[in-house]
From Swiss-Prot:
Assembly information from the UniProt record: Part of the 30S ribosomal subunit.
Domain of life (superkingdom): Archaea
Any GO BP: translation
Lineage: Archaea, Methanobacteriati, Methanobacteriota, Thermococci, Thermococcales
Similarity comment text for this entry: Belongs to the universal ribosomal protein uS10 family.
Name of the protein this chain belongs to: Small ribosomal subunit protein uS10
Source organism (scientific name): Thermococcus gammatolerans (strain DSM 15229 / JCM 11827 / EJ3)
Record keyword Ribosomal protein present: yes
NCBIfam families: uS10_euk_arch
Length: 102
């Protein structure tokens, strides 16, 4: 049987967990084997900029950080389960990538 590998990424961890919970519920309802969600390392993007636009004065800096949370879910590629997963309403800040593997 084929498997589907679902990769989820988002800056909003609550929205990401809601989508993974919906995938879990679909797997339980359809009776399909599932492994995950596996939390992958969080990517931290840091940007440091000078506060002063002209370069005069003391060197003070602003620090900004963006965290990208990722999850990985492997599920059996049952036709019924995959149709239901495709119908999940996904928030704009969550990206989903579905890949079929054998």
């Amino acid at each position: 049987m084929q498997k589907a590998r679902i990769k989820l990424a988002s800056t909003n961890i609550k929205a990401l967990n809601e989508v993974t919970d919906q995938i879990k519920q679909i797997a339980e309802r359809t009776g399909v084997r599932m492994s995950g969600p596996i939390p992958l390392p969080t990517k931290r993007i840091r940007i440091t900029t000078r506060k002063s636009p002209d370069g005069e004065g003391t060197a003070t800096f602003d620090r900004f950080e963006l965290r990208v949370h990722k999850r990985l879910v492997d599920i059996e590629a049952d036709e019924r389960a995959m149709r239901q997963i495709m119908r999940i309403r996904v928030p704009e800040d969550v990206t989903i990538e579905i890949e079929l593997i054998s």
